Amino acid sequence: MNIWNWVTSYESDNWRLLRFQWSIFLLTVGARCNQLAVAWWALKETGSASLFSIIIACTIGAEVLSKPLLGWTGDRYSKMKIVLFCNVLTMFSAACLLALSFIDYFSITLVTFAMMLLGIAVGIRDPIQSSIIPQLTLLRSIAIAFNRKAVLSSIAMLLGPAIAGLLVSTWGVTIALIIDFALIAIAISMIVNLNIVGASSTIQTQTTQSIEKPLTTITPPWHTLISSGFKVVFRVKIEFYLALLAMMINLVLFPFFTIIVPFYVQETIQLPAWYIGLLDCSFGVGLLLSSKFLPRLLSFIRFRDRLLMTGFGLLGLNLLAIGLAVPYFILPIFFALGGCGLILINVNTAIVRTLATPACFRNRMVATVSFFSSLASPIGSLIVGLAIAHYGVEITSLLTGVITLTLMLGVALVPNIRVFMRMSEDELDGAYGRFYPSAFR
């Protein structure tokens, strides 16, 4: 079965999940059109990179903060209604930007406000994309569902920038924003009548039932729900340490692509800008192909914890490649391996986190871990920028690779990681509630 048939098949999981994931795909492609259009428009009108950076900083800040502050809404209210609300908010943001572009009026205040609304919508919706999966498919199809999610995300990463660049360069900012608005409208229409069932669990222990019952009978205040997300992550030791590992990955991976790669291509090997695109594309190809084919190739590795360590190893090799001055014609291969490694890390941790967390805490768990991971991006950018200034780009890249390979060894030290990573989907369902009952009270 080819990739297209696989991502559109009805055989392995529910048609509701397929509609939901394809709607997210359209939103992601539309977001790329929006981002490039706004960037091009802002730089053209202001001619100032610093003013444009203010827009980006406010957007990212709104997205990052909305995850822990509003992540509880996905546990308290209907996840599908929350997603629809976020999509409508995204459409309102796109409509504001489109109206401003149509009348040719650029206001940095209004544009920043519209982009912040978009950031809030993305920050709320992103954790739900994972936590809602058990309500849209069967337990036996959870792994397939997360792999398909990764495939569609990878395709969007490859197609989105290309479509956005073509639209902006050929027809201009307004047309790109019209396409974004149209994709959002289609995405909303795909899920507006989509019903979801309760938790997919067929194995409900007394512990899990006692955990979930208070949430339905007693409604805690919003500030308690916010703090409970952090408490759960801190008390479930495996998730606390996995969150630290995720922070360390983002600490080196985000600045690797935003700072190290452009600097290395421009200043060290002195190749044109298209080579940066080639490396990014190679990483995306690794993400795409590994989601479909890598599980079969690595079928001899039976346990998720070993797949997780393999992922850190492949990603570390990618980061080491620049530090070791690998020839430029071989470098894309290492980036493809890095993409494969990132999929192994993300998919296996997401499956365990989503299934093992009791349903009434699932979205807060995902949102809080995502928040910790996002916090590392600006810190890593600052550290890497200073390191390049003092030690050079190759030494800095070498250090990031060594850090990532060290994290591979750190996986083995995470408490109870073998216990949870080696469970079947049926055993994982609500497992954190059984092993850490006090964390969810």
Role assignments for model-derived ranges:
Residues 2-18, 197-244, 430-440:
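Juxtamembrane intracellular "pre-TM" segments in multi-pass secondary transporters
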Residues 65-69, 76, 80-82, 86-87, ...:
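C-terminal transmembrane bundle of multi-pass solute transporters/carriers
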Residues 104, 135, 177, 181-211, ...:
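Helix-loop junctions on the cytosolic side of multi-pass membrane transporters
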Residues 37, 171-178, 225-291:
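A single, central transmembrane helix in multi-pass transporters
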